[in-house]
Amino acid sequence: MASRNITVSEASRPALPRHAKLRFDETRQRWVILAPERVLAPDDIAVEILQLCDGARSVSAIIDQLATKYTADRAEIGTDVVAMLQDLADKGFLTEARESAP
């Protein structure tokens, strides 16, 4: 179980927790999230979003970047991104970046 559940919003700054790593698996020829005793194989869209989850960018900035890149409706992309990130957070594969001291 995840030690702390988060609620994802556009203000969130998501990142993978220390125990989870996004890696390209040469054997499977696909991206995977590796965590202790768990492996998740996200689809290509999820991988693109996860690569933007660096703890510095807000969900809002991620949505803006994707909406611009794909010339898509921001509201629709926003709904999908928040739902996907919330699902990963609920499963313990995503956490909120800690505030850093100035």
Swiss-Prot record:
Q: Does the keyword S-adenosyl-L-methionine apply?
A: no
A GO biological-process term: pyrroloquinoline quinone biosynthetic process
Pathway participation? Cofactor biosynthesis; pyrroloquinoline quinone biosynthesis
Single GO molecular function: quinone binding
The reply to whether Disulfide bond figures as a keyword in the UniProt entry is no
- The cysteines covalently paired via disulfide bonds are none
Q: Which Pfam families match?
A: PqqD
Subunit structure of this chain's protein: Monomer. Interacts with PqqE.
Q: Which family does it belong to?
A: Belongs to the PqqD family.
Q: Which NCBIfam families match?
A: PQQ_PqqD (TIGR03859)
Protein's recorded name: PqqA binding protein
Q: Which gene encodes it?
A: pqqD
